[in-house]
Design a protein with these regions (language model features):
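Thiamine diphosphate
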Residues: 37-131, 141-163
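Structural signature of the thiamine diphosphate
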Residues: 140-197, 350-358
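Generic long, charged, amphipathic alpha-helical segments
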Residues: 271-304
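Glycine-/acidic-rich phosphate or pyrophosphate-binding loops and their flanking alpha/beta elements
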Residues: 10-14, 236-259, 272
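Conformationally flexible catalytic loops at phosphate/diphosphate-handling active centers
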Residues: 166-251
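Peripheral docking tails and interdomain loops at the edges
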Residues: 315-359
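N-terminal glycine-rich anion-binding loops that anchor highly charged ligand groups
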Residues: 7-44
Length: 359
């Protein structure tokens, strides 16, 4: 496909094509519905014959994330993708990568749980993604696409943020976004970085370069408590910087809104239709969509609390993001949650009824 060509594809396919085009060096993954098309598309496209990108199906999600760890140590642009149960298996590796300050991209195309659950869409991985699902005090940078176009656009953005802050980044997409087909313009081809460029950009990397006075050693282990605290404080300082600089969100019809919906991913798309219906009935509703879930747009939610009569957290789960909204609002206005479970996506009319009932 030529640059700027409009094509029709699934969200998962857009992830794969964007990875090839944005200079990704390696993908290590394992098939699981509803994200298997990422690996399948890479296998069909055979980027190892064109860009030199490595594509490998590992024997498990545990192996996949540890391969990503190894690739990230060398300063390469590496990634994996999975769905909810598979992401659970990766949590140890993600904690290790955050502790070692390694940049990489993880894609989670969420399905319903708990346990094996269902293959239908869900947003129930919010806590796991945004609060650090593994052990220790760490965060991933979490991006939440709401369209196939954003699935494509967020691949390069995720890598840029991951390398800027030396931190794993996650694209958190629900199964509906992964499986839906839409028009998309793929990013232009970006060549993979040369070894010299990697050495310049990533002086911390274990590139195998000879002649260093002090070889790079990457680890998250430190047995001296005082030194471990210093490391933690440095990482927390980095998180504060991310919180100050990387909050991204979309506002929709909030100028005159009396009620606000906060939603991400496919739930935000539903919210826009619900707002159209509500406004046709004389109920002034607007939308705040977090584009990046962590860091969360706390200040923007706080501003909402001074403008509206109530806030509805629309999620395809039992209520997770609503906790961050309530923390931000500090009891200044009522905050309610509405969502569906078991892989069922809320209907726009249901959302309007919830606004009428809850407020």
């Amino acid at each position: 496909m030529a640059d700027q060509e409009i094509t029709l594809m699934k969200g998962n396919e857009a992830i794969a094509h964007a990875a090839i085009r944005c200079g990704c060096d390696g993908y290590f993954g394992y098939p699981i519905t509803p994200q298997s098309e990422v690996l399948e598309t890479l296998a069909v496209e055979k980027p190892w014959e064109t860009t030199g990108m490595v594509v490998l199906q590992a024997e498990s999600e545990v192996s996949s994330i540890n391969m990503v760890y190894g690739g990230a140590c060398t300063g390469k642009r590496v990634m994996t993708s999975s769905s909810s149960p598979g992401i659970s298996l990766m949590q140890e590796g993600l904690s290790y990568m955050a502790g070692a300050e390694l940049p990489a991209l993880i894609v989670d195309v969420m399905r319903g749980g708990p346990g094996l659950g269902t293959i239908q869409p869900s947003q129930a991985d919010y806590f796991q993604a945004c609060k650090g699902g593994g052990h220790g005090d760490y965060h991933l940078i979490v991006l939440a696409p709401a369209s196939v176009q954003e699935m494509a656009d967020f691949v390069d953005l995720s890598f840029e943020l991951a390398f800027r802050y030396r931190n794993p980044a996650m694209i958190l997409a629900d199964g509906a976004i992964g499986q839906m087909m839409e028009k998309v313009v793929l990013p232009p081809f970006k060549p993979r970085r040369t070894e010299e460029e990697i050495i310049k950009e990533c002086p911390w990397a274990t590139t195998g370069r000879m002649g260093r006075k002090h070889p790079n050693i990457i680890t998250s282990l430190e047995l001296r408590s005082e030194e471990m605290e210093v490391i933690n404080l440095r990482i927390q300082k980095k998180y504060k910087e991310i919180e100050e600089k990387e909050v991204r969100f979309e506002e929709y019809l909030l100028d005159d809104a009396e009620y606000a919906i906060v939603a991400f991913g496919s739930a935000a798309r539903i919210a826009k239709k619900s707002i159209e219906i509500a406004r046709s009935q004389g109920i002034k509703v607007g939308l705040l969509r977090p584009i990046i879930l962590w860091p969360f747009p706390t200040k923007e939610v706080q501003k909402l609390a001074g403008k509206v009569k109530g806030i509805l957290s629309l999620e395809i789960n039992a209520g997770q993001m609503v906790e961050d909204i309530r923390l931000a609002v500090e009891g200044k206005v009522p905050v309610q949650h509405f969502g569906r479970l078991g892989g069922i996506i809320p209907d726009p009319d249901e959302v309007v009824d919830a606004i009428k009932r809850l407020f």
